[in-house]
Amino acid sequence: MVLDLDLFRVDKGGDPALIRETQEKRFKDPGLVDQLVKADSEWRRCRFRADNLNKLKNLCSKTIGEKMKKKEPVGEDESIPEDVLNFDDLTADTLAALKVSQIKKVRLLVDEAIQKCDGERVKLEAERFENLREIGNLLHPSVPISNDEDADNKVERIWGDCTVRKKYSHVDLVVMVDGFEGEKGAVVAGSRGYFLKGVLVFLEQALIQYALRTLGSRGYTPIYTPFFMRKEVMQEVAQLSQFDEELYKVIGKGSEKSDDSSYDEKYLIATSEQPIAALHRDEWLRPEDLPIKYAGFSTCFRQEVGSHGRDTRGIFRVHQFEKIEQFVYSSPHDNKSWEMFDEMITTAEEFYQSLGIPYHIVNIVSGSLNHAASKKLDLEAWFPGSGAFRELVSCSNCTDYQARRLRIRYGQTKKMMDKVEFVHMLNATMCATTRTICAILENYQTEKGIVVPEKLREFMPPGLQELIPFVKPAPIDQEPSKKQKKQHEGSKKKAKEVTLENQLQNMEVTEA
């Protein structure tokens, strides 16, 4: 995931000042741009010198061949005149005046200079890339410039009644319908581990079927992705911070051969966006085939580092969940990807409108965007039991930022194009099932149970097509109030004092 290097090169029409400004708007280090420009300038100088040295080496070989053909004496003198050691000014005429033995010596020295130059070039290329991969995509003009998403995310529109309040939160409701085992899940899988069971399994499957059917009717191809990716491929679709904060690493045998003891490093996917992004890696996509639209379906795995203490109960923020994802490869021309961006968020909105979930759409501030996103809109549903908006959907246009690293090019072949172009890539959540279940539970709760949204009823089993009944009391109703806790603790303290007094009296009687 990187920007076009030509954007940093003034002689190629680039504007480093524009990228520096983008970094500042993202509240990231603009000095990375200057470091990259310096490393790139030195790299280009080094490559130019290496090209000239290779030409000189070929000239040496050609001159030796001509002299051998003429049967000129090889000579034994390997001393090199001072002016010949200046390779930048060395010409064919200068070489022709030397003996074969001297030219061979010159070729050997040129070889050493090439190796030294190549070593320097590799070092500069690595330095340049380290800076390049930490510089974010160019921002869309409509992105709010701020580093405080809590205060400055811009609300674009609201749908439904986002003021209504209801009694229970999703944390209680998953227990009341007997669809969740949290304590046992944590014993088996660790923190945030859970078992989804009974009615909520049916509700989850109903959401998956409905989401896939909706996307299928809009020209999306359903695709079930691998759950893990090779390290070298994951590096092309994920930014560096994700490896520490989000991704799980798995290590296994590198081969199915019993005598092979090598081990392979892979990463569990955090979203189906990652493997789908790599699906057309190293390909040329024809203009007439675009847009290519995928409805990704996968289990997702996230470490949630940095979320300590947030949403620790229930199923809203968990390490493992199912998700349906919109993913699109688009033309880079005629504003096509931005038209697709609007279409994808509209598709998500219509999905949640059909489920009757109130929401608002927020334009995410520049400081909270990941490197790849040029712009991101979130759909945040209203949770009437929690009294808060919670994120269900993220929709991003990454323009050509991801495609460049994955080498997914636009057009026929390089020979038929004046300049290599890259497709634009977009992604948007359709339905993260556990979060959507939480939103349904809070919005559709009644005194007797959860009313099943009309669009999901055909996917539910008999007896659960209209109402999911409450079968357990709410945990919050089982917890004593602060006043009750205080009274209980006071009674226990008083009882202890009485017991101690009785013991002292008994001791006095015994002694008497």
Swiss-Prot record:
It catalyses: tRNA(Ser) + L-serine + ATP = L-seryl-tRNA(Ser) + AMP + diphosphate + H(+); tRNA(Sec) + L-serine + ATP = L-seryl-tRNA(Sec) + AMP + diphosphate + H(+). Residues 472-512 are annotated as: Disordered. It is found in: Cytoplasm; Nucleus. Its EC number is 6.1.1.11. Its main location: cytoplasm. Coiled coil: none annotated. The modification Phosphoserine is found at S241. It comes from the Eukaryota. Keywords: Acetylation, Aminoacyl-tRNA synthetase, ATP-binding, Cytoplasm, DNA-binding, Ligase, Nucleotide-binding, Nucleus, Phosphoprotein, Protein biosynthesis. NCBIfam families: serS. Homodimer. The tRNA molecule may bind across the dimer. Interacts with SIRT2. Interacts with METTL6; interaction is required for the tRNA N(3)-methylcytidine methyltransferase activity of METTL6. This is Serine--tRNA ligase, cytoplasmic. The lineage of its organism: Eukaryota, Metazoa, Chordata, Craniata, Vertebrata. The gene is Sars1.
